[in-house]
Swiss-Prot record:
It comes from Bacillus subtilis (strain 168). PROSITE patterns: HTH_MERR_2. Residues 71-74 are annotated as: Hinge. Residues 5-24 bind DNA. Residues 76-107 form a coiled coil. Residues 2-71 form the HTH merR-type domain. Residues 76-104 are annotated as: Essential for dimerization. Induction: Autoregulated. Keywords: Activator, Coiled coil, Cytoplasm, DNA-binding, Transcription, Transcription regulation. This is HTH-type transcriptional activator mta. The gene is mta.
Amino acid sequence: MKYQVKQVAEISGVSIRTLHHYDNIELLNPSALTDAGYRLYSDADLERLQQILFFKEIGFRLDEIKEMLDHPNFDRKAALQSQKEILMKKKQRMDEMIQTIDRTLLSVDGGETMNKRDLFAGLSMKDIEEHQQTYADEVRKLYGKEIAEETEKRTSAYSADDWRTIMAEFDSIYRRIAARMKHGPDDAEIQAAVGAFRDHICQYHYDCTLDIFRGLGEVYITDERFTDSINQYGEGLAAFLREAIIIYCDHQENPRP
């Protein structure tokens, strides 16, 4: 079925002007044009628009979304699962913040005095700071002071919501890999997840070349801090991830015909 731009706008809630913009930047091109030059969108185009809107909601820029959707390893089902997990974590945090506001209002109205820790439920930056420090340590170990400083400069610009999105996506990728360990490191879905992991690093932290990615896999089994952290997602995951990274890099360097 084909849809005119006005119909797509009505179905999706995205303005006609925005749809025109997405076409102009080649983020969402209509699959066909009428003889008069009017845009016609297919069901597949609508599915791509859905992905665009989900990625926007969790904080990605349009250029980043285009790069992900156009990536040969893009997996729509896996992306939807990751997006759901990220949005669930955001919902959980928002629910905690709403509860904190409600308890604070009761306290203001003369109810019980709130525990000081409860004042900040849903607002803590502790997990975010620990995640940021982990990446700083990882980069410093792999590439030295200069690149580490550049990475820290880049990540220091992230807001609390940025970091929560990054952490949720990171967590989702690890869980995705851990859930399929029994299929072996060369499993197609495992390899797609490893590709998503590398993309995640490139997007948020540093340019993860294949050589760097291989080195990262080695760090995961030689540094107990990283080994222990990764293995929380599944026994032996660190070593498994290293093997999966090696296979991924080999395939990238010597693509199968």
